Amino acid sequence: WHCRYAVEQGAASVVSVDLSERMLAEARAMTDSPAIQYLRMPIEAIDFPADSFDVAISSLAFHYIESFGGLCAKVNRCLSAGGHFVFSVEHPVFTAQGSQEWHCDAQGNHLHWPVDSYFSEGVRKAGFLGEEVMKYHKTLTAYVNGLLQNGFELLELVEPQPEPGLLEAYPEIMRDELRRPMMLLVSARKR
């Protein structure tokens, strides 16, 4: 989606990196744009020439990698001067407790979201689409300092809440999304 959107907004060329061949195949099936190049590799392995890109975008991927600071250094190198780095991750409050499940009473009502071992960064195992996946919990400090210590200035940090229309349309599902942040959106610029 992001690749197609970038081309629609006037990007001359777009490079997409993903480890999953299935995700790449689905992306390729949605467009035949010659402006989009799809590469299968771990995101940590990117090694593009310096000043190759004006913008780097990532959606919900960095909580699957161990070294955010190391990745920031690589992204900074391949961005042109003043280039933008925009990404989303699962919020550190959401990833702190590996189970990523609400604590409930005997009737199944959500009591609270568990936040434990927040400052203990590292591997967490969570269920995702019926499978156990490995994620790397990082603190908010780790994300912000990973940027600042690798040549970026922070432009905006957003903890999104459900839109009012979603709250009205799906009150049973969405009301709990106001009780804890699930996502973190970040916009930074290369210094």
Regions found by a protein language model. Give the residues of each.
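Core SAM-dependent methyltransferase catalytic element
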Residues: 150-152, 171-191
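Conserved class I S-adenosyl-L-methionine
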Residues: 84-122
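Short alpha-helix
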Residues: 122-123, 134-158
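Acceptor-substrate binding/catalytic loop of class I
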Residues: 89-100, 127-142
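A short acidic, Gly/Pro-enriched loop at the edge of an enzyme's catalytic core
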Residues: 44-56
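A short SAM/SAH-binding and catalytic strip from SAM-dependent methyltransferases
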Residues: 54-69
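Class I SAM-dependent methyltransferase SAM/SAH-binding core
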Residues: 1-46
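A short glycine-rich, Lys/Arg-flanked "PGG" loop and its adjoining helix->strand segment in the class I
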Residues: 69-84
